[in-house]
């Protein structure tokens, strides 16, 4: 082998090694996603419980089914802006739920309504509900560590995201360390009920296709290099043979 063949082979092996590592990483991500899906499926298939029976550990309560009853505090309702549904702009309505026997309120995402600018809602009071009676939902945890303000200038009730640290001062009572997303009819009623957000989707994402892609790239890099070197050596031997014939007696 010539020096350039060694160089090409070295580059191909290094590139293939990187591609194999990327494929193995995608395999680990696929295994993690499948494990998460198994937990998610089990929790969504479980029997709905009242909030008082949720696990105290927020990591264990996520996506557990909940049955909610209580009175909505519409005076402190929030409008979660920038939410799309089937390509249409809109908002989510998030309302504190007060329950008997406790001072702690739970924020409840009651669903999506249309908003042309994904911020302002025409006739907002029409979408309000005074109470929840045996409504079904699932618990979720507040996202953490997202930078930037949550307030929208000029819109007192509008927020960019649910951030319990930033929201605490808005309410005259403590908030639960989780919120509830109602599910059910995903079609907004024209009278007063927002479209529910629906159950979380089980998906493995694109990890499996990426595994095949990276391993295929690694194989192509190695095989292509072998074929190139073999053909180049064959060409060189042919050239040597012709040169030898030309210099013969």
Where do the language-model regions lie?
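Surface-exposed, charge/polar-rich loops and edge strands
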Residues: 1-59, 63-249
